[in-house]
Amino acid sequence: MRVVVIAIGRLKQGPERELAERYRERFDDLGRKLGFRGPEIHEIGESRARDAPTRIAEEAAAIAALIPDKAVLVTLDERGDSLDSAGFARKLGGWRDQSTAQAIFVIGGADGLSPELRRKAKLSVSFGAATWPHQMVRVMLLEQLYRAATILSGHPYHRA
């Protein structure tokens, strides 16, 4: 199963980018043994429109252009479901076991995601009630993807 992360905003050089890349590489290495490919990262520049509704609409159009019809869409949203790591791993493993071609994880910009994208999502995940910078959300998502792979493989990284 191909795993894709679409993120509004670009990670600049620095510790966040290095940490994100470390978890991306770890997932790629372990994930291949489990039937996963990726994660591919697609960065979309933030809209420069003057008002939030226009920014959300422009960003949603750019995101939608990267999502094939049959992909499983997962949004990262503060209104989403709070999953523990084992539950997240079960979701990911379940999609793989159902021969899902792609799981696409979407991280919105500062104004959030469009209601239409949120409705299309098979799952919406929250990393808690707090609002997080998109750079941190990307690192946390990539870490959870790696952690899910370790859970699915029985690797001792996850010690819950």
From Swiss-Prot:
Keywords: Cytoplasm, Methyltransferase, rRNA processing, S-adenosyl-L-methionine, Transferase. Its main location: cytoplasm. One of its GO terms (cellular component) is cytoplasm. S-adenosyl-L-methionine binds at L76, G108. InterPro entries: Alpha/beta_knot_MTases, RlmH-like, tRNA_m1G_MTases_N. It catalyses: pseudouridine(1915) in 23S rRNA + S-adenosyl-L-methionine = N(3)-methylpseudouridine(1915) in 23S rRNA + S-adenosyl-L-homocysteine + H(+). It comes from the Bacteria. Its EC number is 2.1.1.177. It is found in: Cytoplasm. GO terms for molecular function: rRNA (pseudouridine-N3-)-methyltransferase activity. It is an enzyme of class 2 (transferase). Specifically methylates the pseudouridine at position 1915 (m3Psi1915) in 23S rRNA. Homodimer. Belongs to the RNA methyltransferase RlmH family. This is Ribosomal RNA large subunit methyltransferase H. It comes from Rhodopseudomonas palustris (strain BisB18).
